[in-house]
Amino acid sequence: MILVIAEKPSVGAAIGKVLGASSRKDGYLEGNNYIVSWCVGHLVGLADASSYDERFAKWRYSDLPIVPEEWLFEIPKDKQKQFKVLCDLMRDKRVTELVCATDAGREGELIFRLVYKKAGCTKPFKRLWISSLEDSAIREGFDHLRDSSEYDRLYEAALARSKADWIVGINGTRLFSTLYHKKLVVGRVQTPTLAMLVEREGKISTFHKEKYFNVHISKDNLTAELENVKTEAVSYTHLTLPTT
């Protein structure tokens, strides 16, 4: 049998319908030589700092920076049931190969690979790469499944991004929180985005209305423009251009 793993239940249901996996089980669909199951977003993620050392449970400036030599991964408590379902399916002797059917992108690749590796699965898998859940698109995708190795670099890029977010978030948040004695959350994307909003808000709050003029001069095919003139002209000089 072939085990297909989607990113979320709704996608799993759409794929199962096309493949003929119509028998509903606890956490998966089965039928027509297919088992279709799903993740629930990120089932596996990087462990918190306290998982590396108990002393990191308390935020201290002296412990920074925290940079793991070997990364640990964990499954959130509310997602452990579905992770166990996937583990059991991967170990099912009837399953000979898998299809990664998570979203076609960097994060989708990461979601599947972390589950696959955390489960200790070594069975071969192919990649379904589609951008639509129309029945015809799903059929076309399964007719042209891609080799998993084509997406190894995509997975590595996603994993590097995840680790970078962890390093910036854990260390930045603890640094500024301990320095200013209040929780200040820092993120690789969140913080610069917030800075842009603050900068924009500052410009709006200090904005003062000003009267200005835009001067336009046109003659035949010639156009001249002077923008943002602060002072209104009290006299005018006329320029006569020769015509041809």
Predicted feature residues:
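Structured, non-catalytic alpha/beta "coupling" segments that mediate domain-domain communication
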Residues: 26-52, 191-233
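Intrinsically disordered, low-complexity regulatory segments
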Residues: 1-159
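Conserved small/polar residues in nucleotide/adenosyl-binding loops
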Residues: 237-243
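C-terminal or mid-to-C-terminal helical accessory/interaction module adjacent to the motor/catalytic core
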Residues: 138-214
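Generic structural motif
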Residues: 9, 41-43, 105, 133, ...
